[in-house]
Every structure is written in C-alpha cells, then in structure tokens.
C-alpha cells in the first residue's frame, strides 16, 4: 500500500457530524460495503463546513479527507465542476485534473484504478447531498 494514501487518510479533522447542516446524504458502495455519510453547511452558495463519517477502506478515507479539506469555502458550482471531472477521470483515459484541484493527483492516478469505486464514493455522496 502506498504510504502517501495512508498519510492523507490520517488527516481526520473533518471527520465529524455537522449538527446544523443544510445538506446531508449517505452513500454505500454496493461492491465492497464501504459507507459514507456527508453533512454540509452551505451559505450563499458556498460550502462553509464539511463533515463526514465513514466505515470504509483507507482509499475512501483518503479521498474524503482531501475532498473535505479542499471544498470548504468553495462555491457549489466549483464543486460541481470538480465532481464532473473526477467522475469522468477513469473513463476518459485519466484526463488531466484542473490546476485548481491538483491536490487530487495524489490519489487519482492509474496505479489506483482498481480502487476507483472507493475513491469515487465521497464524490458520489457529495453529489447526492447537493442534488447535483
């Protein structure tokens, strides 16, 4: 296993429940059983807080850790664009990730393609929460 993935997954500062959330969703990976609950607080079309709880593998934990820390103070439209890029990443022959989101290059690469569903679970949960 990649030590970089473990290091990213160990950042759990947003592993919390937001009591006064404005958006919330739970999503489960039917293939492996990973489960992700996302709670978001959105004000003036901007994500101002992001909390998650998960019972999942380290790849899913690394993905949600990066997504949560990168999403705070970003406009919902920007997150929507990121979701589109990431969801098409593996299908589009590993398309380049926009500069604004280059931090995701740490986990989205061809060596992790076998863990695609684990990496995408947090993105699907956010999409569900925001009804995108």
Which residues does each predicted region cover?
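Domain-level signature for proteins that mediate thiol-based redox and metal-cofactor handling
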Residues: 1-132
């Amino acid at each position: 296993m990649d030590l970089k993935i473990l290091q990213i997954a160990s950042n759990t500062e947003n592993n919390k429940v937001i009591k006064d959330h404005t958006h919330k969703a739970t999503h489960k990976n039917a293939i492996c059983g990973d489960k992700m609950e996302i709670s978001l607080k959105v004000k003036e079309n901007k994500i101002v807080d992001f909390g998650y709880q998960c019972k999942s593998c380290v790849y899913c934990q690394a993905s949600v850790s990066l997504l949560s820390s990168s999403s705070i103070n970003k406009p919902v439209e920007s997150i929507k664009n990121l979701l589109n890029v990431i969801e098409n990443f593996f299908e589009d022959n590993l398309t380049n990730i926009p500069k604004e989101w280059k931090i995701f290059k740490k986990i989205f690469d061809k060596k992790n393609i076998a863990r695609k569903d684990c990496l995408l679970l947090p993105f699907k949960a956010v999409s569900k929460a925001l009804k995108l």
